[in-house]
Amino acid sequence: MKLEHNALYFKEKIANPCTGTHFQLADRSHFICNVLKGGSTSWEMFFAENRIVHTKIADCYADVKKCPDTSDIKIIQVRHPFERLLSTYRHLFKNGGWKSLDAAHLSDPKLEQDFIRLFSKSWPQFVEEVVIQNELYIKEDDLRNINHPGSWLKTHWAPYWWTCDVCGQLPDFVLKTETLPWDLPVLLESFGLESNLNFPDIRVTGSDDDFSEGNRVTKEFIGKYYSQLTRRQILELWEIYKTDFLLFDYSIDKYLEMLEEL
């Protein structure tokens, strides 16, 4: 069985302990798994603004009493895999976001130089060398350890099937960032909350942001960036994220059409 298929049915460890979150509303416990660059910061702000008690999976390891054995409502939130990949590049690479997300380089001059070289790559280099060729190679056990150098950064472009226990969770709701304005009212009502409750739209940038693109949404730049890639690269990216595309009914068509229009 292929690794990604096996991961759909069995997950020995939760891969992303800092975005998988238990939260409580009116004596009911719920759970959301959302990926990095897939709206996780917006949910953090939503919990804080509405004083919703929440506990990350990472904190459950320290005190299992903080986390329930079962959840009333289980949620997975996703985003188009290619839009999320570009959002990752803009944040970590173009705008230098990697510097504040991995402190290991601060005490290791060689690692710092390696990271500077890696995260200075152009968009086509990132796609070809880092994603397709897997230049930032980290063993799977180390990748599941968020304190291992580079693992937290690489998780930003890890597929959904790897990050969330997709089928094991049996989610009650699958939210998409693209349809969130329509999805949220239904979800909020299921929580017993007002359907028009404000949900923040948080866009995280890095310390090197020169604001050449402003704090604008990534979808505005899809054509600018993906038109720099070859058909082979886009198809190879699709192979890497194929399970995510098929699971959540996303399409590659418009990305291929961009190349045909050039």
Where are these regions (language model features)?
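Membrane-interface amphipathic segments in extracytoplasmic regions
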Residues: 1-262
